[in-house]
Amino acid sequence: MTEVLWPAVPNGTDAAFLAGPGSSWGNSTVASTAAVSSSFKCALTKTGFQFYYLPAVYILVFIIGFLGNSVAIWMFVFHMKPWSGISVYMFNLALADFLYVLTLPALIFYYFNKTDWIFGDAMCKLQRFIFHVNLYGSILFLTCISAHRYSGVVYPLKSLGRLKKKNAICISVLVWLIVVVAISPILFYSGTGVRKNKTITCYDTTSDEYLRSYFIYSMCTTVAMFCVPLVLILGCYGLIVRALIYKDLDNSPLRRKSIYLVIIVLTVFAVSYIPFHVMKTMNLRARLDFQTPAMCAFNDRVYATYQVTRGLASLNSCVDPILYFLAGDTFRRRLSRATRKASRRSEANLQSKSEDMTLNILPEFKQNGDTSL
C-alpha cells in the first residue's frame, strides 16, 4: 500500500491569502489557482477495511497458493517427466507463483503491524521486486502457453518442431531475462519512507520525489508487458475458437483442454490483471495531476479501489494451479496416479509398522506366561 506523505492546505484558506498581500482581487484569484495547483496535496482518508482487506486476501493467497503450487512443482519434477513444451511453461509459471507466495508472510505482518515496516529498506525493495516479477512473468508465461496451444490446434502438423521441449526451455529462459531486466528499476523506485508519526512505510510504487519518472516507467511496462501480451492472447484465443468450430474435434482431449485454457486465462485477466493496471494508472495520475480541493474525495475513492485491485492481482497465484489441472498435458491423470501410489505406500508403511509392533509385543506376552494371543 502506498503511504503518500501529502500535506494538506486548510479548507478555510481563501484566495486572497494564497495570492499574497497587495494583489487585486482578479490577480489574487489567478494567483490562488496557481498556488493551489502547485502546492496543494490531498490528504488521503483511509478507511478501516484497507487495513484488514489486504492481509485477509494475502493469508488466503498464501495458504492456497503455497499448497497448490507446491503440489504442482512436485508433480512437474517427479511425476510429469518427460516434459512436453507446455509443461515447461507451466512449471515456470508455478515457480514464479511459489516464489511470490513465500514473500507474503512479511507483507501480512506489515499490515497487521499497522503498516509499520520493520524488515529494512532492502527487504522492502525485494518484496516489491518479486511481486512485479511474478505479475509480469505470469502474464508472459500465460502468453507462451496460449501461443503454444494455438500452434497445436491451428497448425498441428507444421508446429511439431516448434512445440519441442528444447524450444520451450530457451523461450522460458528468455522470458525470465526480459522480466528481470524490465522490472529491475523497481529496486530503485521502491523503498521505505518515514511518516510524521515516525512509523516506516514500504512504498509499493514510489515516493513523491520520483513520481513523475515512475509514472512514465509504469506506462511503458504496462504497454509492453501487459497490453501487448493481452492483444496476443486475445488473437490466439480467437483463432483457437475459430479452429475448434470448423475442425472435427468433438469431445477430443485437445478441444476440452483448449476450452479450459481460454476460460481460465481470460478469467485471470478479467479479475486480476485488467482491474489492477487500470486502477494503478488512475492512482498514479491522481497523485500527479488531480491535486485540488475539489478532487480529494475522488482521489480517496481511486486509492481505495486501487487497494482492492492489489488484492485481486495476487489471486492469480491461487488460480494458476487450476490451469495445470484442467488444461495441462496429462497433469490430472498423473496427479491421480501419484496420489494413489502415495496412498498405497502409506498404507503399506502402516501395515509394516503394525506387524513390527505385534512381533515385538508377542515375546513379552509369552515371557509373562500370557497365551491369550
Curated annotation (Swiss-Prot):
Gene: P2RY1
Binding-site positions, ADP: 46, 203-205, 283-287, 303-306, 310
Disulphides: 42-296, 124-202
Membrane topology: Multi-pass membrane protein
Subcellular localization: Cell membrane
Keywords per UniProt: ATP-binding, Blood coagulation, Cell membrane, Disulfide bond, G-protein coupled receptor, Glycoprotein, Hemostasis, Membrane, Nucleotide-binding, Receptor, Transducer, Transmembrane, Transmembrane helix
Stretches that traverse the bilayer: 52-74, 88-109, 126-147, 167-188, 215-237, 261-284, 304-325
Stated role: Receptor for extracellular adenine nucleotides such as ADP. In platelets, binding to ADP leads to mobilization of intracellular calcium ions via activation of phospholipase C, a change in platelet shape, and ultimately platelet aggregation.
Glycosylation sites: 11, 27, 113, 197
Gene3D superfamilies noted in UniProt: Rhodopsin 7-helix transmembrane proteins
Protein name per Swiss-Prot or TrEMBL: P2Y purinoceptor 1
